[in-house]
Amino acid sequence: LGDVYKRQKEIHEQPKAVQDTLNSVIKNGVINLSSVEITEDEIKNFEQIYIVACGSAWHVGMAAQYVLEDMADIHVRVELASEFRYRKMPLNQKALVIVISQSGETADTLAALRLAKEKGITTMAIVNVVGSSIAREADKVFYTLAGPEISVATTKAYSAQLAAMYCLAVQFAKVRSKITDEQYSLSLIHIS
């Protein structure tokens, strides 16, 4: 009974987790990624995005791929962290590697992050735990504000990760001049 209660509690906490995550970067009707420490010049110059994760976070990446490619007109590849680590594939040096991990301690994701950094590729972490290994080692960090997630089945962390990725897609589209000011404003209205 305890696990069911915890899961239900976390399901009901999803709206707050999403709103807190959105409020961390949306100020006065615009997305402000200064806390993530990514510049508009960097956003303009990325040629590709790799999204690397495991489990449910990988599913967030799959959904985000469609939004990023559609809105920001940038090529996106989603990779399981274990595959990213061991496959021999050419990596675009002008890419951004986004790793997603609720805990910030997922072993394969951390190893993939380290590999990307060794290759000289800019990295960004989307994590829920401040001070986690992945957060400390990534070049840029977008914190989700879902709070602790006790239930095995992810709920609020998953939803907050989706919200974070949508914010990135909208801001990349705006900075890369792929959407109009009106489309940008409407996108923010839809998620707020």
Task: Tell where the protein language model's regions lie, with residue ranges.
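A short, well-structured juxtamembrane/interface segment
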Residues: G29-K44
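Short, small-residue-biased leader/transition segments that mark boundaries at the very start
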Residues: L1-Y5, I191
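Edge strands and adjacent loops of beta-rich recognition modules
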Residues: K16-I26, V30-I31
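An acidic-aromatic substrate-binding cleft motif
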Residues: K9-E10, T21
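Glycine-rich phosphate-binding loops that contact phosphosugars or nucleotide phosphates
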Residues: K44-S185, I189
